Amino acid sequence: AGTAAALAPADAVVLAAEDPLAALQRLATAWRRALGAQVIAITGSTGKTSTKDVLAAMLAPHRRTVATRQNLNTEIGLPLTVLSAPPGTEVLVLELAMRGAGQIAELTTISEPDVGLITNVGPVHVELLGSVEGVAAAKAELIAGLHAGATMIVPAGEPLLAPHLRADLRTVPVGPGGELTEADLDGLELPFDSAHMRQNAVAALAAARAIGVEPSGRIEVALSAMRGQQRQMPGDITVVEDCYNANPMSMRAALDDLQRSAPGRKVAVLGDMLELGPDAAAHHAAIGEHARAAGVDVLVAVGPLSAGLAADHTVADAEAAAALLPGLLSPGDTVLVKASRGIGLERVVEALA
């Protein structure tokens, strides 16, 4: 505290705390309560950022909404998001990150959500949590942390979440066989038609309805960076930039979208999926098989784990992929670039710009 005071300008107000992080979190909770805004908290193995983006776009014409920006979704970022909300904010849409047990519980305690949303559960961070059941239990900390009478939105028929559901919550299953399905998107004009993005939109619609908002018309969605945006590159090359994260679920969804939407040759540059635990090799081999089944014409594997993809070309790292790829492409190609964030495949995209 003395050092902070010494470094501060003479006219500055210095708040000293023995535990600055705990103080930041308590300030965020106090401001959340003072705002009186409705809080929607989103987590899941895949799709949480896209779902957050779609939900914020659905709410914006109806309510003064503040949503998580960039990756401010941690024990530091979430309080900063809450504290960034100006007076008069009516809805907070918060993304909750998770890399271990107890983290979702901590973020739920800080944000005190009125609506919880779990997009899905899959083999993500298994290396840290031991099993997919452990992943489900960590995500379900959101369910445990809601106040009685709150709304909880879950994927319909997900057996891994069933033991964690609560009778004193309004549980809304979404997706095939659920209370809301893709049919409920009729009448909405969405700027995407991929299957996984439409499923995210169904979950977002359920959250909007949970707070009394009925979206309509065109939904103007601005997706967060490096999460599946299409970019037109010189030489009539289309790049799908999806470099922020990767796991078996999101890899399959991205490959399925490539199969459905690419009019010309399909090229996939796929890097390592991290934190998959002892089954990592099997997961990577399965993705290689899925890529072939999806009609990928040229498959480039990046990283040691991705050697198991049985690709046409295997390279050690992003720099090698960036050097190789331009020579493999032809006008009209669509290129999917996807890996876990730590692989840095945005460098491949930059090489094509």
Residue ranges and their predicted role:
Residues 314-317, 332-350:
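Peripheral docking tails and interdomain loops at the edges
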Residues 224, 235, 243-314, 318, ...:
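Active-site beta-alpha connecting loops in nucleotide-dependent enzymes
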Residues 5-12, 115-238, 263-264, 289-298, ...:
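Acidic, Mg2+-coordinating active-site environments of NTP-dependent enzymes
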Residues 16, 21-156, 160-168, 350-351:
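Phosphate-binding loop of NTP-binding sites
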Residues 109, 322-329:
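Short amphipathic alpha-helix with an adjacent loop that forms part of the alpha/beta core around
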Residues 24-27, 55, 59, 81-82, ...:
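Buried hydrophobic packing segments
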